[in-house]
């Protein structure tokens, strides 16, 4: 394995082309070993592209978590709203059931009252028939008595 030193005071100065080639070779050797230089020329274990992608992924994850938090708040609000509407619907349902039962009760009361009135009408009709029969009987008695009186007066 070849070891290169970027700063070697013993060597004589190299031409810029050759120095660039040696620097590139050194970077390639370090890259093969899993070491890389970043934009500030600091030695890193991760490839700068991978590092940048990691940072971007971390930011995207943070944004995603923030959006999930907002989504959960919105969903929580919707759930509360739906629960409130369900309670109101249940209350209205109970009111409707109560009103229906009240109407049934009123209908039954009216039916009972109607039956009572019909029974009273039937009773009054029977009483009227008795009075009519009694009246006819009294009219007959009156006619007989008037006839008797007339006969009595004419006989004298």
Curated annotation (Swiss-Prot):
Keyword field: Cell projection, Cilium, Cilium biogenesis/degradation, Coiled coil, Cytoplasm, Cytoplasmic vesicle, Cytoskeleton, Differentiation, Golgi apparatus, Spermatogenesis
Biological processes per GO annotation: cardiac muscle cell differentiation; centrosome localization; cilium assembly; cochlea development; establishment of epithelial cell apical/basal polarity; establishment of planar polarity; inner ear receptor cell stereocilium organization; intraciliary transport
InterPro entries: FT20
UniProt superkingdom: Eukaryota
One GO cellular component, as annotated: intraciliary transport particle B
Region spans: IFT57-binding: 94-156
Tissue: Expressed in retina and are more abundant in the inner segment of photoreceptors.
Main location: Golgi
Cell location: Golgi apparatus, cis-Golgi network; Cytoplasm, Cytoskeleton, Microtubule organizing center, Centrosome, Centriole; Cytoplasm, Cytoskeleton, Cilium basal body; Cell projection, Cilium
A Pfam family: IFT20
Coiled coil feature spans: 98-138
MF (Gene Ontology): opsin binding; small GTPase binding
Function: Part of intraflagellar transport (IFT) particles involved in ciliary process assembly. May play a role in the trafficking of ciliary membrane proteins from the Golgi complex to the cilium. Regulates the platelet-derived growth factor receptor-alpha (PDGFRA) signaling pathway. Required for protein stability of E3 ubiquitin ligases CBL and CBLB that mediate ubiquitination and internalization of PDGFRA for proper feedback inhibition of PDGFRA signaling. Essential for male fertility. Plays an important role in spermatogenesis, particularly spermiogenesis, when germ cells form flagella.
Subunit structure, as described in the record: Component of the IFT complex B, at least composed of IFT20, IFT22, IFT25, IFT27, IFT46, IFT52, TRAF3IP1/IFT54, IFT57, IFT74, IFT80, IFT81, and IFT88. Interacts directly with IFT57 and KIF3B/Kinesin II subunit. Interacts with IFT88. Interacts with CEP83. Interacts with SPEF2 (via C-terminus). Interacts with CBL and CBLB. Interacts with TRIP11. Interacts with TTC21A. Interacts with SPATA1. Interacts with USH1G. Interacts with CCDC146. Interacts with CEP78; regulating IFT20 stability and localization.
Protein name, entry field: Intraflagellar transport protein 20 homolog
Gene: IFT20
């Amino acid at each position: 394995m070849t070891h290169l030193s970027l700063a070697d005071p013993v060597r004589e100065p190299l031409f810029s082309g050759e120095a660039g080639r040696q620097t590139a070779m050194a970077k390639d050797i370090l890259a093969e070993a899993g070491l890389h230089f970043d934009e500030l020329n600091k030695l890193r274990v991760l490839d700068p592209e991978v590092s940048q992608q990691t940072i971007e992924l971390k930011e995207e994850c943070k944004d995603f978590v923030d959006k999930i938090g907002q989504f959960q708040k919105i969903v929580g609000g919707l759930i509360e709203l739906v629960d409130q509407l369900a309670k109101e619907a249940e209350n209205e349902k109970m009111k409707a059931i109560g009103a229906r039962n009240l109407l049934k009760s009123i209908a039954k009361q009216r039916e009972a009252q109607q039956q009572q009135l019909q029974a009273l009408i039937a009773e009054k009709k029977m009483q009227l028939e008795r009075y009519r029969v009694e009246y006819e009987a009294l009219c007959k008695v009156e006619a007989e008595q008037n006839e008797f009186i007339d006969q009595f007066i004419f006989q004298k």
